[in-house]
Amino acid sequence: EIAVVEMGASHSGDIEKLVTYVEPTCGMITNVGRAHLLGFGSFEGVKRTKGELYDYLKAHDGLLFLNESNADLVEMARQREMNRIMTYGQSDDANVQGEVSECAPFLRFTWRNMATTESKARTYDVQTHLIGAYNIDNMLAAITIGLHFGVTPEQINHALSHYIPANNRSQLEVTAKNKLIVDAYNANPSSMAAAVENFKLMSVEHKMAILGDMRELGEVSALEHQKLVDKLAEDGFKEVWLVGEEFGKTQTAFRKFKNVDEVKAEIAARCPENYYILIKGSNGIKLFELPELL
């Protein structure tokens, strides 16, 4: 009855082409980050390409699900004077509102539907199995879409609280030696900054980060990798392993490895123990091979 299709893009015009195949009646951009800059040319290129979905929805009277908390997305919608919008976010103006209760380490949050016909919107409390406060936007997006298509709040809460990630995205793995935060499917400056910031705020001892190159950043690659290692140093991280050619060019005292095989050799010789370890990098760096060794 409902098809959910990801509009993947790495070059300008990709979305414009895909919407002609799919002809969406509803649409949502979850985020605009500094990803695939090699293909898009710039952050403005990212916004312009993703905005091609908005252009199609506007022309065909489609419904836009909009994150009211994301200034870039709000501005993109405002520029196009979108016809039909259902909003969500950590904002008092959103139709579906939510806020983080805790991340210890899993995200717990509350939400309410301000667009309800009831005299007072009910507040719901949801405990998830997701790592990272940044995931509240994903939760609110799912809630908003579910409500639009007639899914009850009770069904929504049950689905979100029982979802356990198993795709190397924001998942916690507990081994005999360590606790791992595995987010090794993809990485760009925006998502890496969010993951590191969340890790910094976690009130646990013995933190360690194993970070892989952020691919496809083009001419800003050196700058973005250096900015990240500088931020890690400023935030007081002591145990950081950097993996890949781009991190290898940075000026830092953190340990560097050319590839994942060198990391495996180090783990075999001296496996870290009793650490909370953040593992994040672009999929091509293959950090997803590390959890079974740690």
Describe each region flagged by the PLM.
Residues 2, 26, 141, 272-280:
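Short SAM/SAH-binding signature in class I
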Residues 20, 264-272:
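Short amphipathic alpha-helix with an adjacent loop that forms part of the alpha/beta core around
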Residues 10-22, 190-199:
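Switch II of P-loop NTPase G domains
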Residues 26-179, 204-205, 230-239, 246-254:
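Acidic, Mg2+-coordinating active-site environments of NTP-dependent enzymes
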Residues 271-294:
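A glycine-rich beta-strand to alpha-helix segment
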Residues 166-168, 184-253, 282:
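Active-site beta-alpha connecting loops in nucleotide-dependent enzymes
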Residues 254-263:
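Short acidic-hydrophobic, aromatic-tinged amphipathic segments that line or gate anion-handling sites
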